[in-house]
Amino acid sequence: MKELNVALLGLGTVGSGVVKIIEENRQQIKDTLNKDIVIKHILVRDTTKKRPINISQYHLTEDINEILNDDDIDIVIEVMGGIEPTVDWLRESLKRKKHVITANKDLLAVHLELLENLAEQQGVALKFEASVAGGIPIVNAINNGLNRSEEHTSALQ
């Protein structure tokens, strides 16, 4: 079975929630997409910081280039917040044909059109969801948004 490789940008309250939700819904995601979901990288500001969840099985990095240069990453999930440098990271992710899911309202308020146009040009998905309940909508974006669109799931197969 193929893997769906994910990079998570941020491991605060929402990012920790995303990790928990992905772990709790791993089988549902696998059944829906017929792929094993793997959190391959997690970008954090400080890899030595104590975390509220067990992250021993995950690769933490402070270097965005590890994610951008990893051709195996299918989806970048951004929950760091802020506009700069986040918008640059999302633009570069889209340019490298990585699907993007974000919960960043501030960034979208300023750069939504730019990111949507870039996603369309690259043939990848840009999904945005509110971060209610620490990440639940992220699973909806993975299951429904990427699975329901032939155009976008072809890149995941």
Predicted regions and their residues:
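Generic secondary-structure signature for well-ordered alpha-helical cores
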Residues: 23-27, 120-124, 144-151
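A secondary-structure boundary/capping signal
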Residues: 10, 103-104
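Short, surface-exposed amphipathic charged segments that create phosphate/polyanion-binding patches used
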Residues: 56-57, 141-144
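Conserved small/polar residues in nucleotide/adenosyl-binding loops
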Residues: 151-157
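Short beta-strand segments
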Residues: 43, 129, 154
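N-terminal glycine-/serine-/threonine-rich beta1-alpha1-beta2 phosphate-ribose binding loop
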Residues: 1-95
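A short hydrophobic/small-residue beta-strand
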Residues: 99-101
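Rossmann-fold NAD(P)-binding glycine/threonine-rich loop
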Residues: 80-96, 105-142
